């Protein structure tokens, strides 16, 4: 399993940032690996809302269907994405920080079946993709104000069953 966790501080209030990031169809605006993103159901975003994302990863386009499994405005939102080869869990939290809101992006990506043998290589590539997405998110949320970014050490854990 590949794991990525990083935080940025932004000037917008948590309610505004939560509303933007909980609509995963906006991912294309800030994650350069995402080439398509759309909401599949519902007018309002909430638990159970589904999204279709197509991302380029390791030279291939991969389509995943994501579903919101946790929706706690303006504190946290968790997406669970899946296709035939991978499972992705993306959790975004929003916390007060001095004169800002701290946005923490915590993601796990696990290969399914026999593909799990490639998990160590996946972890390295996933961290590069995560760093580019975080840089895009920082630009999108605070275009005029560069913010501090912190990322925990890259790690890979045991593959999901």
Q: Which residues does each PLM region occupy?
A:
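Glycine-rich portal/gate segments that line the openings of hydrophobic small-molecule binding cavities
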Residues: 38-86, 102, 132-151, 159-161
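Hydrophobic ligand-binding cavity/cleft-lining segments
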Residues: 1-40, 46, 158-161
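Structural motif
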Residues: 11, 71-73, 97
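Amphipathic alpha-helical segments that line or abut small-molecule/effector binding pockets
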Residues: 15-18, 131, 135
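Beta-strand/loop substructures that line and gate deep hydrophobic ligand-binding cavities in soluble
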Residues: 80-132, 149
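Extended beta-strand/beta-hairpin segments
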Residues: 1-3, 96-98, 149-152, 158-160
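Well-ordered beta-strand positions in beta-sheet-rich domains
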Residues: 5-7, 63-65, 89-91, 106
